[in-house]
Structure formats: C-alpha cells, structure tokens
Amino acid sequence: MTLKSFDIVIVGAGPAGGHCARILAKSGRQVLLAEQNDTFDKNDFSSAATPIETLSKFDLPESAIGSYWHKLTIETSKVSQSWESPKSLGVVLNFAKFRAFLASEVKGNGSEVWLGYRYIKHSQANGETIVEFKQLSDGKIIQVSTKVLVDATGFARAIMYEKENDKPDFLSGTGIEYLIEVESEVYDKYANDLIFFLGDKWMPKGYSWIFPMEQNRLKVGAGRIFLDPKTVKNLEPLKKYIYLLIDEYLKSKSYKIIDKHGSTLKYSQGLKDIYCQDNIIAIGDTVSTVNFLGGEGIRHGMDGAEIAGKYIQQYLDGKISNFRDYETEMHRKFDKKWHISERLAVRKYIDDVDDVLTDKTIDYLKYMKTEDVMDILFEYKFEKISRGLGGYLIRKIQGFIQKFGG
C-alpha cells in the first residue's frame, strides 16, 4: 500500500507548530499539521497577552485579537502600581481564533491540517519516517510518510521521549483560567488594563491575572510554579484565588462563567531539552521556549519556529545533514535571558518571604518610564532595573532626612 507522503509532518497545532507549518507551506513544501483536538475551541488554554509588536512581526490579523491594552498594572499584597501609554501597548489574542488563523494559512497554501488525530508512534522504513495517527472520531489508524518530523506537542514531548520514564526531571507549573462575562461597569473599568497580581495575598508561590477580552468579558487566571516539593505543601486550590479576584478585586455581583481551561508547564532547567534526533526536530514548549519567570510562550515559540523552519528548508534542500546548528542557534538566542529568568523565578516563588522581594521590585519599577517597564517585563531587559534606582534612592534619602532631621 502506498502511503500519503509529505515533506514535513508537524504534530501539535499550537503557536509554534502552526506558525512553523505556515512558513513551510508558504515556501511551497508539502506539510501536514496534525492536532489531537478536533476543534481549536477545545482547551483554549493560553492567557495570550503579548506586546503590540507581535502583530506586525508575525503578520497576525485583527480577527485574532480579543482586545487591546494600553495600561499595565501590578498589584501586590501591599502595593498597587500602574503604567500607561496614550497608544496601545499590546493585545490579548483570542487563542482559538489565533490558532485557527495559522491553520487556515497552512491550508490556503496547499498543505493539510488534520484535527482530531492523535500521534501514536513513528518508525523508519526504506529511508522514510512512517508516522502513525489515531483518528479519534472512529479509532481508525492512519499512517503517513515524511522526510522531516516535527515535535510541537508542548509539555508532553510525545515524539522526543517515547516513554514517560525516559523524561528527565522538569521544573513544572500549572495554571487555570476562567473566561467570565461581567457587568458593563465592571468591564469598562478594566477594559484596557493588563493586571498582574503578585504576593501571598493574591497567589502564594505564583501569580494571578485579569486580562480584558471582547466586550464585557474578562480572563481571570492563577498560576503556580513548583520549583521543589516544599512548594506543594499546604497550598490552597488555584480556583480559590480566582474567586478572590472576582469577589474582592472586581467585585462583580452577577458574573457568568463562559469557559474554564488550564494547562501544565514542564520546563527544562538550563535548557537541556532534546532539540533534534536524526530527521526529527523539536519546537515550542517541547524545547522550553516559554519563559519560566512569567510563563509567556507564544512569541518565543513562534520565534523558535522561524529558526527551525530555516534549518528544515536547508535539510530538505540537502544543504545540511542534521539539525545541530538549529540547537546551537536556539541556545544562542535564549540561554542568557532564560537563565536569568530561572534565577529570578527561584527568588520570587521560593525565597521571597513575606513578599519582601516583590515589594522592593515594585518600589524600583514605580519610577520608571512605561517603555522601560515593558522592556523589563516582556523583553527581559533586566539591566534596565538599575534605571529605577535613581528615584528609589532619592526617596530613601528623603525618608532618612525626615527621620533624623527633626
């Protein structure tokens, strides 16, 4: 029997998988993008906030946008600080529509998208890679052949690690998010504001958030980082902190829950993931492109997908025989900032007793320009924190004078 043949099979239609398939399909390659969920509305698991530059960089349409925001707020147990801009600072993507758009681009450029197909296994035969899927609607097993196989299965890492026992220890995190419909007056108050909550009052050993979506809808979520077994003990369920935000912060009296979803993060400390093996290449969360400090992954997964796409093209053209240069370039791009983020995550989520570090950080940031705060939070330019020390030191000196100057 002759199997259907592709240049590239990509398993997982998240941001990295969808964007990689989109790039390769546009270049004329025959791509199969396979996703185990039968609709993009299932497990709509990303909070999906991103800076405004993401739209132009990745050519994303208005239809993928849930809302724009021009204000950024950080709430701690004791402190509230906001930064604003007269123009939009970023968007919250409609994650389902965003992924559906990427898939439509794949199909529009002559390639295929299969929804409701679960990856089972792969094998080598006659110089080709045979990939086996199970069609979830009827249980039918389908095989295809490919020249390159891409693992975009996220934290599952289903292709790179055949058995669960083969996986190394990962740092892990988990988050849940409610999409709620609120009264117009509540929505209007927070419609343009990206709000993060830090500190033991709002979310011990993690953070929570309120993001605007379409009219009268807000995303309310909470995430927790497990850096060591001590973290897990004596912690309340995440949903407790979501209801805390709804009841105490939003004070919505007649909200309606539209959707609940959640996800897990498995992050390789030191970026020691398997990036490639023979003609198999891994992208997105499969190689920890999500930033561990804040859990943001969409932009970084798409960045990595573009790097992978470049090397896949070279491989198919016979210019390279393996993907080692891909691994090298990924480390060059991510290592430094990700390592700093790891260390900050440990300090914030494990070592920050009574929110001392959190409050001190906000004390630094409050004197900074909005664009500098955006650079720190979204571009990880941590060196800019020093720019806030001027105002911080001035305030400390003034306090000293008041205390001892009579």
For the regions a language model picked out, list residue spans one by one.
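N-terminal FAD cofactor-binding segment of flavoenzymes
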Residues: 36-74
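C-terminal helical "tail/cap" subdomain of flavin- and related membrane-associated enzymes
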Residues: 310-406
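Glycine-rich FAD pyrophosphate-binding loop
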Residues: 9, 13, 23-44
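Conserved Rossmann-like nucleotide-cofactor binding loop
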Residues: 16, 39, 156
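Beta1/beta-strand and adjacent pyrophosphate-binding region of the FAD-binding site
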Residues: 2-16
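FAD/FMN-dependent oxidoreductases across multiple families
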Residues: 226-311, 316, 320, 324
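Short beta-strand to alpha-helix junction loop
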Residues: 85-104, 229-237
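Predominantly flavin-linked oxidoreductase catalytic cores and closely associated redox partners
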Residues: 13, 108-250
